[in-house]
Amino acid sequence: MGIKLIIADDHPIVRRGLVFFLKTQSDIRVIGEASSGNEIIQLADELQPDLILMDLLMPGLNGIEATKKIKAKNPYIRIIILTSFSDQDQVIPAIEAGADGYQLKDVEPDVLVQAIREVVNGGKSLHPKATDQIVSQFTKKRKEDAKIDELTTREKEVLIEIAKGKSNKEIATSLYITEKTVKTHVSNILAKLELSDRTQAALFAVRNGLVQNQ
């Protein structure tokens, strides 16, 4: 029967081009098309494809949100993000949502076909630019973890209080230390984390899971 595939993209010309090309592949069968996030969620349920080619920016739910919902209900459906965007703000959330592949629309047709086959067989397929973003994020996380390890227990406590939006006076009261001591800790925290102000410190704490987003 071959690979059953659905294309999700809000641009008809993109869907038409993909359908035209994929028809030349004897082992791939396009069984549906969707133009929005809500539509692809419904089609995935109804048609139970082997794989979805998912655009990121669509009306209603975007591709990342749609991927998350589809994977939650049908984890065996494979999803390749096919988009024009390769920035970290798109790549990382897409992979975290459960996407099995991430390709750009400038990909060579033969490479896309190879990606489809690899992903259906249980593999992963990432465009080199997407791989670069993942490696960059991993490297950044390791560097931030190392910076956190440099903080003393008390400095971590102060950082958490900063992330909660407390003033130096409030932090002093919470931790039973003087306001002057708090100021010293804040200066040390900013220096060790290589940050310029309290706002950046608060964002750092939230981003690294030291405190829940307030």
Question: What is each residue range found by the language model?
Answer:
Residues S36-E39, N62-E65:
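Acidic catalytic/metal-coordinating carboxylates
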Residues L47-L53:
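Active-site beta3 strand of CheY-like receiver
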Residues M58:
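Receiver (REC) domain active-site loop signature in two-component systems and cognate sites
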Residues D89-E96, D106-T153, E157, L210-Q212:
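Short, flexible helix-to-coil linker/hinge segments that flank and couple to helix-turn-helix
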Residues S167-Q200:
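Recognition helix of helix-turn-helix DNA-binding domains
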